[in-house]
Amino acid sequence: MRRILPDSLSLRRVAGAVLAVVAIVVVFLVVDLGPTTVAKMAWRRAQKVADARNRWVTAHESGKLAAPTPADAARGFSVFTRSTLLRVGDRDAPRQGEVPAALHVQAAWNQYEAAQLAVHAWKAVDGLAIAATSLTDASGHEIPASAVDLRMERFYAIALSIHVHNRFGVVPKTLEPAVPVAAAAGTTRPFWITVHVPDGQAAGRYHGTVSIRAGDQAVDVPLDVDVLGLALDEAPMLLGPLSLPVLRNYTRAGPRRATKIAERAGVAFHDIREHGMTTLSLWSAHTLRRDAGGALVLPDLDVAMQLFGRERFPKPLLYAPVNLLSTNKLGRAATYRHYDSSVAVPLAREIATTYGARAAALGLPGLILDPIEEPNYALGLDRHDAPDLRQKIATELLAAMKQAGATTAMTCTPETALVGKGNLDYWLVAYKRFTPGVFEKARKAGAHLAMYANATLTGNGTSFSRFFFGYWPWATGLEGMTAWTWPMTPKRFPANLDPARAEGALDVHDGFLGRDDRPVPTIQWELAREGVDDMRYLATIARLAARARSSGDAGAVRAADEADAFLASVKAAVVRDPHRYTFEDPKTLAPRKAFGWDWTDFEARRRSSFELLAKLSAFAG
C-alpha cells in the first residue's frame, strides 16, 4: 500500500497539472479568439472524430440497369446518354432509357448547348476516342464539326458538400479536351459535348454523328440539333464571378511578366463573357501610380476596362479596391491593421471621380465600386478592437464614394447592409444569410438586391448551379447573382485529394489551361451557363410576347397569351426562400427533387421555352 498510494497521488497531481494547462490554453484561446470561434473549433473537431468512419461516400445508381446487347458484349463497351444534370460515376453502367444512345439539343444563334455521352467498358479497351462530324440540314446548310466541342470528364476525389462536414467522394469535375484513353473493365468514361450554333445559322434541324472508337470497334451516335433563327436577349441582371484576382499582381510585375498577366486576364475575361455572364468583379492590385501631373493611375483597372470593353459586357464592371484601401478580409483581420482613414477616404473619392469618368469615356456600361469585403460582426480588427470597427470603415468609405458620384456595392448580410446608411446601391447578400425578408428590406432602403452564392461555381452540385444562375433569380426579381469566384483561377483550380481513388487532371498547364490553351472548365461552370441561358430564354419570350400582343393580330395575341401563361407558371413554381432548394442528399450527392424541381423539370421548361420562341418569332417581324 505504501508504494501504491504515492503512485496514485502522483497520477492525480499529473492529471491536475494537465487539466490546469488545458484550462489555461482554453482561457487563452477564448480571450484571443473569442468564445464563438473557440466553440466552432471544438465542434468541428468533434465532427471530425465522429465522422472518421464515414468520410468516403460511394454513390449508388438508381433505376434499372440495361443489360448489354450481344453487339455491346462483343465490342467490349456500351455507349449511353444521360442528362447533364445527372452525374456519371466512374463505374456507372447504362440504365434503361439511356440506350440506345442518341443526342438531341436545341439552341439559338451564338448559344452553346451541352449534352452528355458516356462509355461503359465491359472489358478492358485501349485508345478510347471520340469524334464528331459536321451537321447538315435538308437544304444543305452546315454547322462545321469545329463547332462541336468534345471533352472528357475527369474524376476527382473531393469534398462533397459545404453543408456536411468531412464527406468525400469521387465525382466527375473538370472537362479536358478529349484524347484517346484506356478504360479498364468495369469502368466508365463520360464525355461532355457542347454545340455552338454560329450567328445567322439557318433555322431548322441539323443531323450529324458522334463516333466512339476503340481499336477497330466503333459506335456511331446520332446528333440532332434544332436551330432557332434568332439570338437570345442578354440576361437582364448582374451575373458573374466575384473578386477575380487575375490582375492583382499586375502593378508589381516587370514588363514581360505584366504582359503575361494581362494576356491571362484576357483569357479569363473572354471565357466569362462566353459563358453568358454580364459582368465580373475585379479584385484590385496592391499599388497605385501617379502620372507626371499627379493624376491617379490604376494600371490594373485600366487593363480591366480595356478587356471589359473588348468583350462587350452589357452591365457595369465591379471593382473592389480592397487591397488599395486595406479593407480585404484575407488573413482575417490582419489587413485592417494597415487601414488609415486619412489616406483611404480621399483615395476612395479619387477612384470614384477619376475612373467613373474614364469608364464613361470608354463607353462602358458603367463602374460599380465595392470598397470593403463583407464587414460582418463576427470579426473585428484585433482582439482589443471595438466589434463594429469594420462597419465604421464601411460607412465612411461608402459615403466618400457615393458623394463623389459612384455607384456602390458591398458583399454583406442583411444586418451589415444597414451600415451603408443610404450610400449602398447594391446589396450583395450572402446565400447563407439570405431570407425572403431581405427583398423587402432592400426595397425600403432603395437598394438593388443581389446574392452571392459561392457553391454555384466552386461547389460540386449540378442543378444548384443551373437553378441559381437562371430560374431562381429571374422568378424572384433579383437584380444580380454572383459567386466567389471564377472556378478556374490557378489557385482555385480543383485539387484531387486522393490520387489512389481518382485520376485528377491529365494535361493542365499554367494552373488552368488545357492542351488547347483554353481554360479547362468545371461541370459547375458549364451548368451555370445553362442557367444563364434559361434566363435569356425567359427574357426573350417576355419581349417577343409583348411585341406580338401589341401587333393586334389574333394569332399573335394567342401566342402572347400562351407565352405569358408559361412565364407565370415558371414564377409560380419558384419560392423566394433559396434554402428550400437542396437538389441532392448533402451526405451522398444522390439526386432528389427539390421543392418541385428535378432534372426533368429543367429539361421540360427548356423545351417549352424553345418551342414558344419558335412560335413567337413568326410574329417578330
Where are the predicted features?
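N-terminal Sec-pathway targeting helices
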Residues: 5-22
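Membrane-interface motif at the C-terminal end of an N-terminal transmembrane signal
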Residues: 25-45
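Surface-exposed binding patches on compact interaction domains or structured appendages
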Residues: 40-99, 122-193, 201-202
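Contiguous beta-strand segments within globular domains
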Residues: 100-123
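Solvent-exposed, conformationally flexible loop/turn segments
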Residues: 107-112, 184-188, 203, 348
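Aromatic-lined carbohydrate-binding surfaces of glycoside hydrolases
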Residues: 120, 156-176, 180, 187, ...
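Catalytic domains of carbohydrate-active enzymes that cleave complex glycans
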Residues: 348, 352-386, 396-415, 494-621
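Catalytic-core region of carbohydrate-active enzymes that cleave or remodel glycosidic bonds
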Residues: 425-503
